[in-house]
Amino acid sequence: MSFSIELELQKFPLTVKLRDGKRATLRPLKKNDEKDFHKLFLGIPERERMFIKHRVTDIKVIREWCKKIDVGRNLPIVGVIGTKIVGVATLHQQLGGWRRHIGRVSVLVHPDYRGRGLATLLVETIADIARRAGLEKVEAEFIGEQDAAMKMFALLGFRKLVHLEEYVKDMQAISHDYVLMGLNLKVDEEYAGVGG
């Protein structure tokens, strides 16, 4: 099956209903989202920002991301309520090499909008795109303290693959446990079509 991410993106924007009854729009990040996207990161508590691999408080970093969107490598889907970007999930892909069949998922939701199911909807959307793109697996990386996020991913079928104690350092050089979770996207051919 031939798959084009650009073709898949034509189904956006999507309107979704959150647990609290409010509606959110899911859509790809756009070049002109720079200021609103930066505001999302500024709204994340400093303690949590230490776990983000990039200096997201620097507008230049966000500007570069928005300017150079390459959906084949990094596909960010944002969650918007009203006109405010309140969450993002990204599918990170390697286009060659021995991990080309594995995508990586990252997700972030503004604290004021957590607990409404937005992160779940964003990750499900990204996993669906990954599956349709022919990826066989997706992974998600965590710092050991991110219990709520790991629980949400587990409810979506991700399982713990690796847990390394005191393995990574945050932006303040403090060591933390590293956890890698994964989801198998490949349908077992033996069971394909069963029950239908």
Q: Model features per residue range: what roles?
A:
Residues A24-D36, F158:
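A short beta-loop-alpha structural element at the N-terminal edge
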Residues R47-H54:
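A short gly/proline-enriched turn/hairpin at secondary-structure junctions
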Residues H54-H101, S106, H110, N184-K186:
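Acetyl-CoA-dependent GNAT
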Residues M1-D20:
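Short acidic N-proximal helix/loop "leader" segments that mark the beginning
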Residues E166-G196:
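C-terminal "cap" of GNAT-fold acetyltransferases
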Residues V107-V109, G115-R132, K151-L155:
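Conserved acetyl-CoA-binding loop-helix of GNAT-fold acetyltransferases
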Residues K22-A24, G82-V88, H176:
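Glycine-rich phosphate/pyrophosphate-binding loop shared by adenosine-nucleotide-utilizing enzymes
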Residues E139-F142, A154-H176:
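Conserved catalytic-core motifs of GNAT/GCN5-like acyltransferases
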